[in-house]
């Protein structure tokens, strides 16, 4: 593993710890639709990055790391089974604008 890959790995692991600290309990209660909304929101934010912005690459890396942290959180959640509809109303969505 290159030094850069090692750093990226450490960042993703740290992001996962932060994600779990902030959202550990709600993660257990969100249904699959809420997870989809979270990913849609990140994709919209990636689409909104202006390539002319001198900080576009940094912004893209930040958004990709957020997606990586979400992916890891969902992978861990999947160890307990697929989040189902039974969880949909437990925690109200804070991302209703990203619903299907």
Regions found by a protein language model. Give the residues of each.
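Flexible "arm" and connector segments at domain edges
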Residues: 1-100
């Amino acid at each position: 593993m290159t030094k850069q890959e090692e750093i990226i790995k450490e960042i993703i692991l740290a992001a996962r710890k932060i994600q779990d600290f902030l959202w550990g309990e709600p993660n257990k209660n969100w249904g699959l639709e809420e997870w989809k909304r979270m990913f849609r929101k990140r994709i919209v934010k990636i689409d909104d990055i202006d390539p002319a912005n001198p900080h576009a690459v940094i912004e893209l890396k930040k958004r990709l790391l957020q997606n990586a942290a979400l992916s890891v959180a969902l992978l861990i959640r999947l160890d307990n089974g697929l989040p189902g509809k039974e969880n949909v109303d437990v925690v109200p969505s804070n991302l209703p604008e990203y619903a299907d």
